Amino acid sequence: MCVMTEEARDEVDRLVAAWRTERPDLDVEPLQVLSRVSRLAKHLDRARRAAFAEHDLEPWEFDVLTALRRAGKPYELSPGTLLRATLVTSGTMTNRIDRLAQAGLVRRRPDPEDRRGVLVSLTDTGLSRVDAAFADLLRREHELLSGLGAADQRTLASLLRTLLAPFDSPS
């Protein structure tokens, strides 16, 4: 068993110790990992929101713009592909595309291969805004991980990938 110094203890260690005292009949070991993941997720969410706000973007706007950016030149996708990439409904995606178009971040054009369809693409403004926000986000994420060396980051990424695999598998 690992003995921790007071400096190495964190709020989760105190939480786990309290539950072990109050409910010794329960295995509270999952809290060691998942409470820390939950706390980190809150810090990441704050970092993401700060990066996006600095570039006048909402999280949902960033999600749509990055889906287009990752598509590569000409940074263009169908609304159906966008909704699958962002896991929202058709009505929600239509509303989001409308709002992004009004803001001058995306444009629509007829799909030359499907007369009934449209394609959505980044404008120059959308491209520069998403690129700047993404660079800022990565800077903040590097700060969040600064307590871990590169090897530990790779190990953690591998463990988290294993943990997430059942949830990310196609149904």
Where do the protein language model's features map onto the residues?
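N-terminal leader segment of winged-helix/HTH proteins
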Residues: 1-55
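Anionic, Ser/Thr-rich low-complexity intrinsically disordered regions
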Residues: 4-13, 55, 59-62, 71, ...
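N-terminal helix-turn-helix DNA-binding core of bacterial DNA-binding proteins
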Residues: 28, 38, 42, 46-89, ...
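Short amphipathic alpha-helical segments with heptad-repeat character
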Residues: 31-34, 38, 42, 87, ...
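Short amphipathic alpha-helical elements of helix-turn-helix/winged-helix folds
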Residues: 67-71, 159, 166
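Charged, amphipathic alpha-helical coiled-coil/dimerization segments
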Residues: 98-158
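Generic C-terminal helix-cap and adjacent flexible tail
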Residues: 165-171
